[in-house]
């Protein structure tokens, strides 16, 4: 029995070593903020946050609906933080890629953040849709927000923002990211949901270091 236990421990150690040696790793020298297409806040803000999210991720939804509005009011709108959004659809999530394209089409009409929030609120309604049914739903959402539906539908049908979404996805992979949400807060990587209090501590510390 003792020999079996030792063998199991050794096997687990080897698995762990394999993960360390061959698991996902970020490529050196990559800037998570470089080329970000969507942002809130002043370009001159002392602290930058980069948010890699997925529209069907529950923790991302919790952050977007319950934490981000408070961060926006306290840190972003007051010029302390610049907040960058990046898409991180997982393999096989064609509907998340399409939703991300739709958010970019909303950005063309100046409403990225609003549509971003609505996608999270309505995730349970569109999460199982695909193809033309999904497109119709995404266009209807835009219309409910007062966007130009025809322009939005043409944008979505053109696929002109698809490469931007896929570029974000590739960057996330190249950075070695394995889960959502993942945040880079003044360059420091954090993965998983953070409460507002945790955000406040991290941002206040980062701001203090900039003084």
Region locations from a protein language model:
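Hydrophobic single-pass membrane-insertion segments
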Residues: 19-28
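Structural alpha/beta surface segment adjacent to cysteine/selenocysteine redox centers
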Residues: 45, 50-143, 153, 173-178, ...
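A short beta-strand-turn-helix
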Residues: 30-47, 75
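A short linear-motif detector with a strong N-terminal bias
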Residues: 27-31, 60-64, 161-163
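C-terminal cap of thioredoxin/glutaredoxin-like
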Residues: 1-20, 35, 52-54, 65-68, ...
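Short clusters of hydrophobic/aromatic residues that line enzyme substrate/ligand-binding pockets
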Residues: 38-40, 126, 190
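Periplasmic c-type cytochrome electron-transfer domains
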Residues: 28-31, 135, 199
């Amino acid at each position: 029995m003792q020999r079996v236990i030792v063998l199991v421990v050794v096997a687990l150690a080897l698995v762990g070593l394999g993960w360390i040696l061959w698991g996902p790793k970020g490529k050196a020298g990559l800037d998570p903020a470089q080329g970000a297409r969507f942002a809130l806040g002043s370009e001159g803000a002392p602290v930058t946050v980069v948010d890699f999210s997925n529209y069907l991720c529950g923790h991302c939804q919790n952050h977007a609906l319950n934490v981000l509005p408070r961060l926006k009011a306290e840190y972003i709108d007051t010029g302390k933080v610049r907040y960058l959004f990046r898409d991180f659809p997982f393999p096989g999530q064609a509907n998340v890629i399409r939703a991300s394209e739709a958010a970019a089409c909303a950005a063309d009409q100046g409403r990225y953040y609003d549509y971003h929030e609505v996608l999270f609120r309505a995730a349970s309604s569109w999460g199982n849709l695909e193809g033309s049914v999904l497109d119709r739903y995404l266009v209807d959402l835009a219309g409910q927000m007062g966007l130009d539906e025809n322009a939005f539908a043409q944008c979505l049908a053109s696929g002109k923002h698809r490469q931007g979404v896929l570029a974000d996805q590739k960057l996330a992979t190249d950075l070695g990211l394995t889960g959502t949400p993942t945040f880079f807060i003044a360059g420091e990587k954090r993965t998983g949901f953070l409460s507002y209090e945790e955000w406040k501590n991290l941002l206040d510390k980062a701001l203090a270091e900039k003084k």
